[in-house]
Amino acid sequence: MFLDLTRCQINWVHEDTFQYQHQLNTIVLTGNPLIFMAETAFNGPKSLKHLSLIQTGISNLEFIPVYNLEQLESLHLGSNHISSIKFPENFPTQNLKVLDFQNNAIYYILSEDMNALDKATNLSLNFNGNDIKAIEPGAFHSKSFQSLKFGGILNLSVILKGLQNSTAQSLWLGTFEDSDDQDLTPAMFEGLCEMSVESINLQKHHFSNISSTTFRCFTQLKELDLTATHLKALPSGIEGMNALKKLVLNVNNFDQLCQINAASFPSLTDLSIKGNMKTLDFGAGCLEKLENLQKLDLSHNDIEASDCCNLQLKNLPHLQYLNLSYNEPLGLQSQAFKECPLLEHLDLAFTHLHIKAPQSPFQNLRVLQVLNLSHCLLDTSNQHLLAGLVDLRHLNLQGNHFQDRRISKTNLLQPLNSLEVLSLSSCDLLSIDKQAFQSLGKMSHIDLSYNSLTGDSIDALSHLQGIYLNLAVNSIQAIPPLLLHTLSRQNTINLSHNPLDCTCLNMHFITWYKENLQKFEGVEETMCANPPSLMGVKLYDVELSCGITAVGIFFLIVFLFFIAILLIFSVKFLLRWKYEHI
């Protein structure tokens, strides 16, 4: 059970405040200016695991009551005025997994203060935003942590020396957008040689005189994040980093991909170089030494290549994830990804693709499951564009246009027998042939939103059932009664923001809609557009009277009366005429 009392102007927490809340496991008191907390303030919950006292004005940990906190796993004390991390005597820390001191006034960390955490295992300790000036030698001696965060601290040598003989899975030493970049020298990392750590984040620092010796103490690392560290190149000759599995080089200043000197990291399985501050030259064979690479993110780099991508991705036989989205035009030949036959996820969104062969550039990707081709300016008339993708499950074609603004019976989707999720949003479609999706028998999710489709296009889905169908923001006015059976077979439908007709001509659909409201999402935005008197009325509120009214019955009787009189006079006239001509 979760209780959030954020910014409730609470000043006092009295004895046994929560005494009847036995199931409570989380208490959030963030933003309350606390003046007093009784010793038994947290009595009651049988298993209180999470306590948030962020921005409560605490300046001393003695303020926190110790009773009934034996099960506590996370304690959040950020944005207070705490200057010492010395806990009250007998404070239960044995089950703590998260201890957050970020944005306090902690300048010194003493060995005595750290001893209270000896019983905690796999602890994540957060000192971000504290201007730590010194750590007493031995304060972290022989201690093991899940993660340590010292973000925003300028003098990293103080931190790394203070962490000697400690162990951490993750060490976060980056800075933030509102702080000055700190110049890092090789000498600052000397302390790293005296501790055990697997992952380090150094984002937004600045390397001075970077050389291969800068990384002398990085040999044990499995993950290294150098985001926004103003790097123009990584030095050649870096040795001993055979353990590194993940390298993040986002938002730097490389001119060419080869400037990362990938051969220095032969065991990499995950490489991210996105958001480069300059146009990145893809090069040729820059990553060929990374034969174990499984994940590669090169998005948002303005990469341009007239012949992509076998030369650039040479010798990457184990690559499973490739992101080339938000780049400049790429020319794709037949089997453009032959070097990466095990690709499972390929993202080319917002990258203009020039397909230079009639055959599919993806035809060798027989295990590809996710393909994002949104806003790629594709030639969708090429029926062979997606040939060979026998295991494709998820396809995004959002923002691509089709010939004559319609999807015909014969189209590029026909080879995709395994497809489950299809997005055709914002494709400027007017219509869909009723047999256009006949080969897509495994579909579970279709997004046709932001087009100009009418109700007749629903007939293309008649062979499907149990799907999520998004038809929001189209031109649907009325849905023929014969198509209601198709809609009734689907799980979830979105018809919001369509110009729906709320007259008797659409009575069958409106009645069915109100009876099946549980199938629909966006019902608050599913409204009438016609007649003008009902414009903006929610469809589920519409009440139509489409039978004959009392006034109608009166006029009908009058009409029939006049017909009867006319008929009588006609008969009399005929009889008289016949008699006169005997």
Annotate each language-model stretch with its function.
Residues 1-582:
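Extracellular leucine-rich repeat
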